[in-house]
């Protein structure tokens, strides 16, 4: 069956026909690590995650790259805030770890590579040099700008004309540029106080003097521009031509428009066959964003609602559709997740019962499983329609409940197939994490055993049997339990 995807560049839904189905190249624009991630960021992550999970499930070989922008004036603006450190690198390191923690909490499948801008400056400089040599870019005052009028298709992605575009970049750049819409590939020097303080919190003292990391280049000491970074990293870790480029709707212009221009000017090839843009998450009628202050961090949402409810919320609406965060939508997501989890648990419990083997096939249940699989696949092939995919699983949950409620004996194979559908479609594709009811008991038992071993170890230490105590500590650490002895006793991290 054919996979269909939307394409912002063509404005149409198209058949997905990769050059090599065993090596589908996907690039997702990641996060500028200047603050804790919020649910608006998570919507992009989760939708991109589900896309690549589905393609893998459907038999494609997928190579997925998601960048980390760790060089940016917004990061510099956070220097000295809340003990984050006094350098751009220190702030970026802090928030990069925060993003990693959030991704793990949301059960995102690992991308193949998470390239960081700071580790790809040589590749960025080489790409800029190619554009200068080809006549698509020019140096001015130690900076390098892309000449948008040299690229005939500029504006095609966003549907704009070059001469109607607003100026790109701060006022200080305008005098150096040949056209107001030209954009910076390389910026001379560090981040100016004006640029940094534009993004700095009002309660923080303003920065003075240039800040941020700089690198030597053929045009002098400076920093890469924002747009060139993604082109260089995509070309380095994927190819000059990729199959799918995913990003937030707010990146269509100027970021992705500029990516296309600089990438295709440098390589002479079509940069990406399909541009998929995830609609922004809204709250109270406005997009959720750090600048508006109307956001909910991923960590807080997961702590309050649980990772499965958050994921269910973010997949309950297709990526091309408007999505709202509110108490009502969170409540709906909670109910959907609980329905799926309860049906999965009831099916698993019924399978374990003696009566599971006593009843012949239940045609209604087995038909419901087959229908759910077919409807789920059809939904995902129709431009990753996660809303319809979730609905297919909810219909299966209803069928499972009808079967379990309607008899004292159960169709073992039918229930087994239902559990498998929940776990492969809801789990492997949508990223939900099902628990058959034994999980909490198993965790509790493991904690009790660990506590017992810690008690024995403390007794060995008290008795002076330090080698035995150290051996127990090492064996615990091999199981992921860190033990550190202090004057106040042992500190344990699990």
From Swiss-Prot:
Catalytic activity entry: tRNA(Cys) + L-cysteine + ATP = L-cysteinyl-tRNA(Cys) + AMP + diphosphate
Cofactor(s) recorded in Swiss-Prot or TrEMBL: Zn(2+)
Region described as Disordered: spans on this chain: 187-220
Gene3D superfamilies named among the record's database cross-references: Cysteine-tRNA ligase, C-terminal anti-codon recognition domain (1.20.120.1910), HUPs (3.40.50.620)
The record's free-text note on cofactor binding: Binds 1 zinc ion per subunit.
GO molecular function terms listed in the Swiss-Prot or TrEMBL record: ATP binding; cysteine-tRNA ligase activity; zinc ion binding
Keyword Repeat: no
InterPro entries: Cys-tRNA-ligase, Cys-tRNA-synt_Ia_DALR, Cys-tRNA/MSH_ligase, CysS_C, Rossmann-like_a/b/a_fold, tRNA-synt_1_cat_dom, tRNAsynth_Ia_anticodon-bd
Motif ('KMSKS' region): 287-291
GO cellular component: cytoplasm
Predominant subcellular localization, coarse grouping: cytoplasm
UniProt EC number: 6.1.1.16
GO biological process, one term: cysteinyl-tRNA aminoacylation
Recorded coiled-coil stretches: none
Keywords in alphabetical order: Aminoacyl-tRNA synthetase, ATP-binding, Cytoplasm, Ligase, Metal-binding, Nucleotide-binding, Protein biosynthesis, Zinc
Motif mapping: 'HIGH' region: 31-41
Residues the entry annotates as binding Zn(2+): 29, 230, 255, 259
Subcellular compartments: Cytoplasm
Family matches, as SUPFAM superfamilies: Anticodon-binding domain of a subclass of class I aminoacyl-tRNA synthetases (SSF47323), Nucleotidylyl transferase (SSF52374)
Domain of life per record: Archaea
Annotated Basic and acidic residues bias: 196-211
PANTHER family: CYSTEINE--TRNA LIGASE, CYTOPLASMIC (PTHR10890:SF3), CYSTEINYL-TRNA SYNTHETASE (PTHR10890)
Entries under HAMAP family matching the protein: Cys_tRNA_synth (MF_00041)
Family, similarity comment: Belongs to the class-I aminoacyl-tRNA synthetase family.
Protein name from the UniProt record: Cysteine--tRNA ligase
Organism of derivation: Halobacterium salinarum (strain ATCC 700922 / JCM 11081 / NRC-1)
């Amino acid at each position: 069956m054919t996979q269909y995807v939307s394409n912002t560049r063509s404005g149409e839904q198209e058949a997905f026909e990769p050059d090599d189905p065993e090596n589908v190249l996907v690039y997702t624009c990641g996060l500028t690590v200047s603050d804790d991630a919020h649910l608006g960021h998570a919507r992009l992550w989760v939708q991109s995650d589900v896309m690549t999970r589905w393609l893998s499930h459907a038999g494609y070989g997928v190579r997925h790259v998601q960048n980390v922008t760790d060089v940016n004036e917004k990061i510099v603006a956070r220097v000295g805030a809340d003990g984050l450190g006094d350098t751009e690198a220190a702030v970026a390191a802090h928030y990069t770890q925060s993003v990693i923690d959030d991704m793990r909490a949301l059960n995102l499948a690992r991308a193949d590579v998470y390239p960081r801008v700071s580790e790809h400056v040589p590749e960025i400089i080489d790409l800029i040099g190619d554009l200068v040599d080809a006549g698509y870019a020019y140096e001015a005052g130690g900076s390098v700008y892309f000449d948008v009028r040299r690229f005939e298709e500029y504006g095609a992605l966003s549907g704009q004309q070059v001469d109607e575009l607003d100026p790109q970049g701060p006022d200080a750049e305008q005098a150096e540029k040949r056209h107001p819409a030209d954009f910076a590939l390389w910026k001379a020097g560090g981040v100016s106080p004006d640029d940094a303080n534009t993004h700095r919190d009002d309660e923080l003292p303003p920065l003075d003097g240039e800040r941020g990391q700089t690198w030597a280049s053929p045009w002098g000491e400076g920093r890469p521009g924002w747009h060139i970074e993604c082109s260089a990293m995509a070309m380095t870790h994927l190819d000059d031509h990729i199959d799918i480029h995913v990003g937030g709707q707010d990146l269509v212009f100027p970021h992705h428009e500029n990516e296309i221009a600089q990438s295709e000017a440098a390589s002479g090839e079509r940069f990406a066959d399909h541009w998929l843009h995830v609609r922004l998450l809204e709250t109270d009628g406005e997009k959720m964003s750090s600048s508006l202050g109307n956001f909910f961090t991923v960590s807080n949402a997961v702590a309050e609602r649980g990772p499965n409810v958050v994921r269910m919320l973010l997949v309950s609406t297709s990526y091309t559709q408007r999505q709202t965060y509110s108490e009502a939508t969170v409540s709906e997501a909670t109910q959907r997740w609980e329905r799926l989890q309860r049906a999965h648990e009831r099916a698993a419990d019924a399978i374990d019962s003696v009566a599971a083997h006593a009843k012949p096939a239940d045609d209604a249940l087995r038909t419901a499983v087959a229908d759910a699989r077919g409807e789920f696949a059809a939904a995902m092939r129709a431009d990753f329609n996660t809303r319809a995919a979730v609905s297919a699983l909810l219909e299966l949950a209803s069928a499972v409940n009808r079967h379990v409620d309607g008899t004292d004996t159960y169709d073992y194979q039918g229930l087994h197939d239902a559990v498998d559908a929940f776990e492969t479609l809801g789990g492997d594709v949508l990223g939900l994490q099902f628990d058959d009811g034994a999980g909490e008991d198993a965790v509790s038992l493991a904690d009790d055993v660990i506590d017992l071993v810690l008690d024995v170890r403390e007794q060995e230490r008290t008795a002076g049997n330090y080698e035995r105590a150290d051996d127990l500590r090492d064996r615990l650490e091999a199981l992921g339990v860190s033990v550190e002895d202090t004057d106040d006793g042992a500190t344990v991290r699990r």
